[in-house]
A protein has these predicted regions:
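The feature captures the beta-strand-to-loop junction immediately N-terminal to the Walker
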Residues: 37-39
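Conserved ABC ATPase "signature" region
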Residues: 107-127, 179
Length: 249
C-alpha cells in the first residue's frame, strides 16, 4: 500500500500554555488540489508551514512521500501572499535564479528555456525583461507562480496567494493557476479564507474550526464540474452554503 503524498499525523501546535491546533490528522494523495479553509487565526497557515518544513508540530509528525519532513526541500515549492521577488532581477531572471538553486545541473540554456515556458503559461512573455518595480501586483504574483512551478516541485504550497489583489485580477490569476496546474497535475495545498476561491480551484476542501484548539471539522469533496468560472451554478451555490454553515459553527 502506497503512502499518502502528504500526511500530518495527530499534529498539535502550542505556544506556551495556549494550544493553537488540537490533534489533527490530514492525508493528501498525489495530484490532488486541496484547499484549507478557515477563519483568521485558526492555524491554517501554520499547517502549511509545517508541510514546507518552516515550522514544526508540538506533537505528532508530518510526512511527504512517506518520509518525515525535517526542513525545507526542493520537493516542495511555496507561493506567499506577497511575491518575494528579487527586485534587482528581471521577471525571467527571478525564475532562472530559482531554477539555478533547485536544479543546479541544468545548463544556462535549459534554465532559460524553462523560464520562457512558464512565463508563457502565465501570460508574461512580453514582460520577461521587466524588473518587479515595473510590474503590477498581479503580474508580480504571476511571476511567483511561474517560479514555483518552474522548479518542478512534487508539492506546491500556496499561502493565500491572491489575498492582496483586487477581485478582477484575483479571478484572472485563479484561472491561470488552474491552467498551469492542469498541465502538471502536481499536488497542491492552498490556504484561503475565500469560499468561492476554494470552490473554483479545489478537488477537496478541508474546513477548520475557530481557534484556539482548532482542528479540521469537515473534508468536503468538490463535485462542481469544470470549468468553474460561474460559481452561481446550482451545484456551486449549494456547496457555498454548506461551507459557510460550517465556518459559522
Amino acid at each position: 500500500m502506497t503512502s499518502p503524498h502528504v500526511e500530518l499525523k495527530e499534529i498539535t501546535k502550542s505556544y506556551g500554555s495556549t494550544t493553537i491546533i488540537a490533534p489533527t490528522t490530514i492525508t493528501i494523495e498525489e495530484g490532488q488540489f486541496v484547499s484549507i479553509l478557515g477563519p483568521s487565526g485558526c492555524g491554517k497557515s501554520t499547517i502549511l508551514s509545517m508541510v514546507a518544513g518552516l515550522n514544526f508540530p508540538t506533537t505528532g509528525s508530518v510526512f511527504a512521500s512517506g518520509s518525515p519532513i525535517t526542513g525545507p526541500g526542493p520537493d516542495r515549492g511555496m507561493v506567499f501572499q506577497h511575491h518575494a521577488l528579487l527586485p534587482w532581477m528581471t521577471a525571467k531572471g527571478n525564475i532562472e535564479f530559482g531554477l539555478k538553486s533547485a536544479r543546479p545541473h541544468d545548463s544556462r540554456t535549459e534554465r532559460s528555456d524553462i523560464a520562457d515556458t512558464y512565463l508563457e503559461q502565465v501570460g508574461l512573455t512580453h514582460a520577461a525583461s521587466r524588473r518587479p518595480a515595473r510590474l503590477s501586483g498581479g503580474m508580480q504574483q504571476r511571476v511567483g507562480i511561474a517560479r514555483a512551478f518552474a522548479i518542478d516541485p512534487e508539492i506546491l504550497l500556496l499561502d493565500e496567494p491572491f489575498g492582496a489583489l483586487d477581485a478582477l485580477t484575483r479571478r484572472e490569476l485563479q484561472l491561470q493557476l488552474l491552467h498551469v496546474w492542469e498541465s502538471s497535475r502536481r499536488t497542491v495545498i492552498m490556504v484561503t479564507h475565500d469560499v468561492d476561491e476554494a470552490i473554483v480551484l479545489s478537488d477537496r476542501i478541508l474546513v477548520m474550526s475557530h481557534g484556539p484548539e482548532s482542528t479540521v471539522i469537515a473534508d468536503v469533496a468538490v463535485d462542481v464540474p469544470h470549468p468553474r468560472h460561474d460559481t452561481d451554478a446550482d451545484s456551486a451555490v449549494e456547496l457555498r452554503h454548506q461551507l459557510l454553515d460550517l465556518l459559522e459553527h
